[in-house]
Amino acid sequence: MDTTIIEKRICLYSKFLDSNYEQHILNKANQDTKNECSQKYGFIIHILKIIDIIDHEINRVNADNVFTVKFEAETLKPEPDKIFRGSVCMIYKDGVFINVLDKQKILIPAYTLTDDYDFNQEKHIYVGKDDTDNIIKEGTVLSVKITASQYNNLNFSCFGTIV
């Protein structure tokens, strides 16, 4: 995961303009960005802190307060050569899917596994060629290096290799 500085507009009802307004803005920003994914930042996992409140205006339609806020956030952006840890969530003869933080699934194609692993069709697991105790099964935690990623329809599609 990375730490990224993001600038965003946050709407806040007037009832939240009290002595804890910064905490209310932080809570609303976390709520608004939950499950958000953009090509620029990737997945916003959690907003850590507000760095600056740049601007404030009142919406003419509904009188909500609109703040332009710069904040620091933990992000997950799957780009080539980045390494992530995740657990195996699906195994097929054609490859393995790794789930990273319940946000991103990464496909490890079978051709990247064939030098080190054999697929056991009966048990749906990959078994190490040199070490039969080295098993890839659902729930196994692995480190994965992204080899390719593409952003489309508010999500990333990723390929990777085990590191």
Predicted regions and their residues:
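Single-stranded RNA-binding regions, centering on S1/OB-family and related RNA-binding modules
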Residues: 1-163
